[in-house]
Amino acid sequence: RRATISAYVENEPGVLARVSGLFHRRQFNIESLTGGPTQNEGYSRITLVVEEPDPGIDQIQKQLEKLIPVIHVRELDRNPVARELIILKVDGEEPDKVQAITDMYDGEALDAGPETVTVQITGSEEKIDDAIDAFKQFNIREIARTGQAALARGAEETARVEERHT
């Protein structure tokens, strides 16, 4: 099954390498991995999307919790607040049509010239997949796509933010 896992970690060099190394050693497949600073200085949130059977997901959480810079790990419910970002570059021969598709996906043109147009779209994984399909008619030259960033819904905390005491 597909799971979104959030890890609240100390923001220090090598944390992502340790997390990805753990997945490599255990032969878990990461579908997407994003990370960045949080509102608390010195801490980051890593969001992982994995496709594993239930025992594998439980094992992932247990192994992540053992890593020293990891403070809290949890699987988000099946419907977290989640978004991805895509930047794509297409042929610029039909800029008005490219803009119409961009608008349809609530996107933004970032760069336009006589040869190419570069646009940005944010949204759910499904929306991003649909946008890619829509832009194929303009010969997609390049794509840069983030992984999923996610938080728990409502007032529920995504992660406990107290420091680990060892």
Walk through the language-model features, giving the residues of each:
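Long, contiguous binding/interaction regions
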Residues: R1-S44, V49-T166
